[in-house]
Amino acid sequence: MKYIVVLGDGMADEPIAELGGKTPMEAACTPVMDELAGKGSLGTVQNVPQGMAPGSDVANLSVLGYDPAENYSGRSPLEALSVGVAMEDNDVIFRSNIVTLTDDEPYEEKTILDHSSGEIATADADVLMETIREKFNNDTFQFYTGTSYRHILVWKNGRVAKLEPPHDHLGSVIGPFLPQEEVLRNMMKESFPILNEHPLNRARAAAGKNKANSLWFWGAGTKPRVQNFREKTGLKGAMISAVDLLKGIAVGAGMQVCQVEGATGSIDTNFEGKAQAAIDALLKDGCDFAYIHVEAPDEMGHQGKVQEKVKSIEYLDSRLIAPVKQAMEEAGEDFRMLILPDHPTPIRIRTHTGDPVPYLLYDSTRQRKKQERFTEETARAADNFEPNGYRLIERLIAAE
């Protein structure tokens, strides 16, 4: 038996007028997920425990079977694992976004336009991060390049600071959301003229692209301690994801991390390549479990792009789930598949909520026959609620 999780990050949403009162999941054409819904079971799950911020870090730990209340030490340390950052117990790790701010006002009066700097390419971001390292790296502060706009700051023997995620404040004046920790606030402020006038950003502006013109720190945490996934479940696991957070969780859990060329973390990602990576892990590499994470619906939610969010869900269905299902069937391999979001990312607010999300659980050996769709509403109507997200994987493995 093989076990597969397909995680459509931020896929759940609310009814949207532009879609005739439907959610993106309802508006999307998803024949494969609907087929599996008719043959499997539906429900809802609370991946984000009450009182915890509704981040992909907390929610994906839950889906993988780790209680965030016991295993979560911050988002950035998990991301740091994926880029090979060596951490000491007293280090504090931060996510260091490169964001787009307005040009003209004093720093505290600038508006944040884009948390992703137009989804800047990693190669371009590394050029800017090298300039940042030349300016700021020392025995206390060390910057590391991650992926696209997502990078890492290590503060040796630092202090955990309360910080605001930039994607929660798009379109807002930044002053009220800047760090209270003076050294962090000053570093962000000093980064602006360095980045804003960088030749690469001048070229981006000339090409009509968003400048990547300021650092933004958030997601502080300390060295993570995550139980080995194989020891915990008895399964050899593989992670397929474009984003450092998920790769870092996998590194911490001792899972195989599959590299996929063209995996971008957005709607232009290599869906087919991710599907093939999962197929190879399960059928060639001896893995029992594959976790396929797709960031695209979440990014489209943050950007407020309704039609693109619908399209990302359709791509998930036709370009990823369909070939994985077909490969398992052609190989004669029994499998169970869990399909779900980690959290909602509603277009209306362009950020995460901690609400319950729909899930679909399919077992190729125990099929029922029913006409069904996989949507938020059909999952709620199933009246099958799991209040502790970290327990849902037990249903996958035990096929309850």
Where are the regions a protein language model picked out?
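Feature captures the catalytic ectodomains and active-site-proximal regions of enzymes
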Residues: M1-E400
